């Protein structure tokens, strides 16, 4: 039976060469497009999947009627400490702020992403110092920053970037360390990192916060508890504000 079907198929292919070629080509193109679509979907759904305990890392977000119900991930810096102090299921709360800046390196202007963050975010993102010191993590009036391996190779080639100056919009910073960070296939790429300089008050709502929950945490229950126990500083902004968390992967 199979042999007979193959004979008929081959006979039709030979007899209807043009139609067969068009059909085979269409099938091949469709298969390639389908495969590329599957690859793209998989790629888009696996951002930051490589991080340790990625299934327990969430981004804090707000949603209030004052802004017509729009969801925002911009929150106050002080909310991080509040979350870890009042909700035992939250193991880590790491505030950070990524901003694209026009910088000058060796008198050449380039675009770079600067990360304002503390040690909690560095630990959560597994950012390691491979050369230099931790001075870039010192508190206020800090004029030192760290550069990633990739950025160091891009802008300084074979030169040692330690001690070099980087001119930013408002400040001149000195590089004191080189860090290793996974900047591929992530939502949080950066070129430089330094201690937070932005306002840390409740009214300066321009930070992002990543939290890491403890194993077996009921996320819906945690969200309900957070909304039922919002800090007074957030309630004063709007009585309709709601706070939640969403998976980063």
Give the positions of each predicted feature.
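N-terminal Sec/SRP start-transfer signal
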Residues: 1-31
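Glycine-rich loop motifs involved in handling phospho/adenylate chemistry
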Residues: 25-29, 135-140
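Alpha-helical transmembrane segments
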Residues: 29-58
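Extracytoplasmic
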Residues: 55, 88, 109, 140-142, ...
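Short amphipathic beta-strand/extended segments in non-transmembrane regions
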Residues: 58-62, 76-131, 233
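Residues that recognize and position ribonucleotide moieties
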Residues: 73, 115, 145
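Mid-to-C-terminal secondary-structure elements
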Residues: 118-134, 143-249
